[in-house]
Amino acid sequence: MSTEQVQVGILMGSQSDLPVMTAAGEVLDELKIGYEMRIMSAHRTPAEADAFASSAAGKGMKVLICGAGLAAHLAGAVAGRTPLPVIGVPLNSALDGLDALLATVQMPPGVPVATVAIGRAGAKNAAWLAARIIGTGDPAVQQRVIDGFNAAAD
């Protein structure tokens, strides 16, 4: 967890996802956006995932980032329980992450999951997208996003 006010929840299905999903936290740290990082599974701990998703908005969170591989149901399960934007990060698995990509992107109408690239690049872009969403209502965050974008172009 970061020291800033928590605005983003970063969730992952298992401990093995941590090396990839920490990339999202690194970007949010750079942008000075507070986050909470948790491990919970749509399959193994569904009540915990449901409780987290259901209470996130009430805790002041603005965006949830979910990373999962294989069946990759975490982002969809969370999106079905929160009014917040959910960003799905498909993680690499036996089928090079294509199974997770398809599971993350194929959601029914009314339960959107914004889906980014597979793996570490996707985790970074999920954080950048979360920052852009938060920046629409926070000029200071928006300026840090602009500054980061411009620095990357140099």
What function would you assign to each model-found segment?
Residues 1-5:
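Basic/polar N-terminal segments that are highly enriched at the extreme N-terminus
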Residues 6-44:
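Glycine-rich phosphate/diphosphate-binding loop of Rossmann-like nucleotide-binding domains
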Residues 17-21, 46-49, 68-77, 96-98, ...:
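Short glycine/serine/threonine-rich phosphate/pyrophosphate-binding segments
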Residues 12-19, 96-154:
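C-terminal binding/interaction regions
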Residues 7, 33-36, 83-84, 106-116:
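Glycine/charged-rich beta-loop-alpha catalytic/anionic-binding loops adjacent to active sites
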Residues 37-59:
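N-terminal beta-loop-helix "entrance" segment that forms/cooperates
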Residues 52-90:
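Glycine-rich phosphate-binding loop
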Residues 15, 40-42, 69-70, 91-94, ...:
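Short, ordered loop/turn segments at secondary-structure junctions
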